[in-house]
Design a protein with these regions (language model features):
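Glycine-/charge-enriched secondary-structure boundary and capping motifs
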Residues: 2-12, 120, 124-138, 151-156, ...
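N-terminal amphipathic/basic leader segments beginning at the initiator methionine
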Residues: 2-37
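A generic structural signal for residues located within well-ordered alpha-helices
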Residues: 15, 19, 85, 194, ...
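Buried hydrophobic packing segments
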Residues: 27, 49, 93-94, 199-202, ...
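Glycine-rich phosphate/pyrophosphate-binding loop regions near the starts of catalytic domains
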Residues: 29, 35-189
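Short, glycine-/Ser/Thr-/acidic-enriched flexible segments
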Residues: 55, 68-69, 163-165, 189-191, ...
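Acidic, glycine-rich loop-and-beta core segments that form the ion-binding/anion-interacting portion
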Residues: 179-214, 218
Length: 341
């Protein structure tokens, strides 16, 4: 009898198109919850369609941001907690867009893996959709890439992309910041999504198994805070001169990004409550204060520069919108850096 040679298939090479299609069907309910009126196409097209309502703006400016979650992803994968890492991804992007004064409009994600596990992928994307709900951004598309040999079977990586909008006259650049302005710090939920290569080194030194669900690991996996709604409410009543999202580089590197070169941030480190996880990291890793401040947010996820007369009202508005916030310093004459007192 003559043998029939069916030949190789894409699935034989490790790429399962049917699994990808099943994933799309599974995540549609999550994505539906993020839909905005401007979204004019369902998931599955070659591109996401979004009708820009430019008539609402005098001179609309689009603001874009893209980011990942760094090696925090490794902790989530090792512990098999996949539901919150998607919130981190959205937060890292929308918070960056927010600091320009923009409203996040839509979000797209990139999910790459060695072998597509529908349960894991849908759990991650459910978290992404949750982050989009919190921030008000529509999840209008994404890419799922199954790449055998590029990644181990259980490994996956994430990237996100966000677009927001702001009227040109309302763009926040930091150009108006002056000597005497007040700096407001808004609390973080933990390390957010930065400094995890150093954190993992501390865990290694302390022989802490990052595959076990300990209180330390849970604290380290707390999702990054999304500041969109609280800060958007604040912007309706208070002129924010500058905003710094405290990410990689910590307080030391991020505040100077919004300052003119003749100004300096004078920060009083006794003014806010530091999350205990940072003291744990510093103590168990024998990490200096200087290194902590230029690596981690140290309890402050967002810094706002405002006129000093608006300090009390700013703190009241942020508190009313569920944020812990403090007056952490002021602007002084200097050379563009941060002075700690």
């Amino acid at each position: 009898m003559k043998k029939t040679n069916k030949g190789l298939t894409y699935k034989d090479a490790g790429v399962d198109i049917d699994a990808g299609n099943s994933l799309i069907e599974k995540i549609k309910p999550y994505i539906k919850k993020t839909k905005r009126p401007e979204v004019i196409a369902d998931l599955g097209g070659f591109g996401g369609l979004f009708a820009l309502q430019s008539e609402k703006y005098k001179k609309p400016i689009l603001v874009s941001g893209t980011d990942g979650v760094g090696t925090k992803l490794m902790l989530a994968q090792n512990l098999k907690i996949h539901g919150t890492i998607g919130i981190d991804l959205v937060a890292m992007c929308v918070n960056d867009v927010l600091v320009q004064g923009a409203e996040p409009l839509f979000f797209l994600d990139y999910f790459a893996c060695g072998k597509l596990d529908i349960s894991i992928a849908s759990n991650v994307i459910e978290g992404i959709a949750k982050g989009c709900e919190i921030s008000g951004a529509a999840l209008i598309g994404g890419e799922t890439a199954e790449m055998p040999d590029m990644y181990k079977n259980d490994d996956y990586d994430l990237a996100g992309f966000c677009v927001g909008i702001v009227d040109q006259e309302n763009v926040i650049t930091g150009e108006d910041i002056q000597i005497g302005d007040t700096l407001i710090g808004i609390a973080s939920s933990g390390p957010h999504s930065n400094g995890y290569s150093l954190i993992r080194k501390v865990l290694e030194i302390q022989n802490i198994d990052d595959k076990k669900n300990s209180s330390v690991i849970r604290d380290l996996l707390a999702p990054t805070k999304i500041y969109v709604k609280s800060v958007s409410e604040l912007m309706k009543k208070i002129k924010i001169k500058g905003m710094a999202h405290i990410t990689g580089g910590g307080i030391t590197e991020n505040i100077p990004r919004i300052l003119n070169p003749n100004l300096m941030a004078n920060i009083n480190t006794d003014t806010w409550e530091m999350n205990p996880i940072f003291e744990w990291i510093a103590t168990h890793g024998n990490i200096s204060e200087e290194e902590m401040r230029k690596t981690f947010n140290c309890g402050i996820g967002m810094v706002l520069a405002i006129e000093s007369k608006d300090t009390r009202e700013t703190l009241e508005i942020l508190s009313a919108n569920g944020e812990k916030a403090w007056e952490i310093g002021s602007i002084i004459e200097g050379s563009g850096g941060v002075n700690y007192v």
